[in-house]
């Protein structure tokens, strides 16, 4: 919920709308869930109906997928797992279209890692919508989402006559979760060396653009704690009922018995206070490290 609120403050083409809901199944109340718009190529969602939508995901859940090198991913020494979310064969994808999409991704990757990558006309800026890549990175960085380095639910899209654009954001089940176990989360930047950003940050102009955009967005980002307070009050009764139905401490240890998030055995209000504190600390940490 917080991640999508942050995303909506940026220039990303589209951020899914979401709403906390009470779910009733067969007449039985089963708790509080987040209802969210699905990602799809659509004039009202991801504007790439005449282009393509890519998903980078090491789970390899897409019908069409490949490893593109160079690129930085925790799962392998070199390469990024790409998949085509749209179009698929049911949408009319042909062998020629598939070859063209893969060739385009290869061209972009080589431009990012090429000797002339800083060149405005032949480097990464020729192919990437740089502002979207900056805003996308900022959302991941604020929410401590490591999935840029371990690609899962990382989306890119391109319209027929546009550049390769970052977004939309999605998932964030690992957002804030790693704060207790990641020194980077508590002291620095978690996605400085992830994905293509490992190369982009080698360009002083890109770094300067990130810092400038950060300072531009910071006043809006500082309003999120008030939004957290508002949602805490709105969901108070719902959360109390939800905690009785689903004890977070019982299924929180899917990671070999380790409490990875740090709030599994906290009360609702204590967990919210922790979330707000971490968020405020991240704003300070990022400001110091850019």
Question: What kind of region is each of these model predictions?
Answer:
Residues 1-28:
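A conserved helix-loop-beta module that forms one wall/lid of the active-site cleft
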Residues 20-28, 35-41, 159-161, 171-175, ...:
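An acidic- and aromatic-residue-enriched active-site/binding cleft used to recognize and process polar
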Residues 21, 33-34, 51-53, 154, ...:
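A broad, low-specificity signal marking well-ordered, structured residues that form hydrophobic/aromatic
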Residues 17-19, 30, 150, 163:
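Short loop/turn segments at connectors of secondary-structure elements within structured domains
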Residues 11-16, 28-138:
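Internal "kinase-insert"/substrate-recognition segments embedded within catalytic cores
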Residues 82-150, 154-290:
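Middle-to-C-terminal accessory/interaction subdomains
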